[in-house]
Amino acid sequence: MKAKTCLAGLLGAIAMAGAAQAQDWPGAKPVTVVVPYTAGGSADAIGRRLGDVLRKETGATVIIENKPGAGAGLGTDQVARAQPDGATLLLASTSPLTILPHLRKTNYDPMRDLAPVASVAVAPVAIVATKALRVDDFAGLIDFARRHPDAVRFGTPGAGTVAHVGMAALMGATQARMTHVPYRGNSQALTDGLGGTVELLVVNSDVVLPHVASGALKPLAVMAPERLAVWPQVPTLAELKLPQAQYYSNFGIFAPAGMSAGLMHSLQAALQRAMANPDYQDLLAKSYLQPGTGVGETFAKQVRQEYASNAQIIKANDIKAE
């Protein structure tokens, strides 16, 4: 009887050990990280550097697959339909989960079909005055916009972008009306901003850095978790008592829903080690990116809150996709 009990215990221990081993990420399969944007942008750079570090640290075969289309919805849907075995991951900003589904029908339910794993980087958004707007600071902008409703034209990378939704939230919070001018990307907005066609630019901060340095543009505030090292004098919107308008591109890793807790924890641990790696930290510094905003439930809660608040802002302002 004792022999049978010991044998059963041994078999159980072996089974448990096998199960625990199966929970380790990355496992035997190659890992495909889908980036739902064209090559060359911030997400692509983050994905490739993160992939390089993960290869070195875990021995995994990491493949970066750019799959743009449908406002980043195409690549996002591919991951949402994948098996939750850790072999297919999404690297994207939170926008395909928290903004896009409120603008158009998607084939995935962002709150049901995808699991936030970790925020890996933040791309700050800058609110910058052009030569066409004579104000000294953010308070001056709001005062002018209140006294001259719709007179201030602000250029963004496009309708339904983080910058657009963030400015809608800002205008609602400050009762300052301004006119949105959507462009097709940061570069087009910058060109018109430098030419004085618009009074204000709301674009990724790295796009305007040289023009701020030359004096052609003046930063009034940043949408970011913390101040930019290159602009230590420029406040964040949270510091200006406008946390509800604190919008920025929060890049994260997402997995198909249904991943086991053990596998999720193993993946999160691998990502945390990779983000602490000097090579990855070097990319953040040189690209003027900030560290991610959280891992696991911390990040998941942020995504849920964004999804809910964006639904209200987009509906209240009748924001449409391009």
Which residues does each predicted region cover?
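Hinge/capping helix and adjacent helix->loop/strand transition within the periplasmic-binding protein
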Residues: R81-A87, T94, P101-Q188, L237, ...
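Positively charged n-region of N-terminal signal peptides that target proteins for export
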Residues: M1-T5
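Bacterial N-terminal signal peptides
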Residues: A8-A17
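N-terminal (or domain-start) structured segment
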Residues: A22-R112, A151, Q175-L200, H211, ...
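An extracytoplasmic/periplasmic, membrane-proximal ligand-sensing/linker region
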Residues: G27-P30, E239, A261-E322
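A ligand-binding cleft/hinge motif common to bilobed small-molecule-binding domains
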Residues: S95-K105, A169-A173, L200-V234
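Stable alpha-helical elements in mature extracytoplasmic
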Residues: S42, I46, L50, G75, ...
